[in-house]
Amino acid sequence: MSSSLPLRDDGALRGSLMLAVFTLFGLGLAYSLVATGITGALFSEQATGSLVRVDARVVGSALVAQPFTDARYFQPRPSAAKYDLTAASGSNQARSNPDLLARIAATRAQVAKRDGIAPEAVPGELLTQSGSGLDPHLSPAGAQVQIRRVAAARGLPEQRVAALVQAATEAPQFGLLGQPRVNVLALNLALDKAGNGESGRDNGVKQAY
């Protein structure tokens, strides 16, 4: 008499269901909650977006660039996304693209006139857009070419503004990763604290959230 395999194996079915439940709740829910809790406890500032507050009011994020049009402020890199957090992107234009070359030429002339420097002295980062369009940093050189304009607009000595730039310059992470950089929002808020910036009022610092 021949034997046949059972059409239904309750033990295997039960094991599959238990594995599915564990995967769903154990890895999908519990792991996420634990990871979120640990992150919030150890890195509370970063976990909430590295928000920057002035007088308990959120004025932006240390991780996201925002536009500054007032001459009293250092200005960030150009943005293809127009500094819109929901539209982060670069232009994706090739270096040979005529539109890109024309825009760079126009921006070079604009920045040179704005900051009172020779066109060839304009750093490349002030002409080109970052990959995300939201890069919050400048190189020290990108900030230094703006010192004269900012100092004149605020009635501050250039040496005072230069010292603020130096103080705001961050070293490479762990001394190895990246390049020296200046967070534009942090520098502009430091300027307001230094004076002639009407800090806490209509100070040109856009509330990003």
From Swiss-Prot:
Assembly information from the UniProt record: The system is composed of three essential subunits: KdpA, KdpB and KdpC.
GO CC field: plasma membrane
Pfam family, one: KdpC
Topology versus the membrane: Single-pass membrane protein
Segments traversing the membrane: 18-38
Job description of the protein: Part of the high-affinity ATP-driven potassium transport (or Kdp) system, which catalyzes the hydrolysis of ATP coupled with the electrogenic transport of potassium into the cytoplasm. This subunit acts as a catalytic chaperone that increases the ATP-binding affinity of the ATP-hydrolyzing subunit KdpB by the formation of a transient KdpB/KdpC/ATP ternary complex.
Entry GO MF terms: ATP binding; P-type potassium transmembrane transporter activity
Domain of life: Bacteria
Principal cellular location given in the protein's record: membrane
InterPro entries tied to this protein: KdpC (IPR003820)
Keywords assigned by UniProt, alphabetized: ATP-binding, Cell inner membrane, Cell membrane, Ion transport, Membrane, Nucleotide-binding, Potassium, Potassium transport, Transmembrane, Transmembrane helix, Transport
Protein family per UniProt: Belongs to the KdpC family.
Protein name listed in UniProt: Potassium-transporting ATPase KdpC subunit
Localization per record: Cell inner membrane
Cystine bridges: none
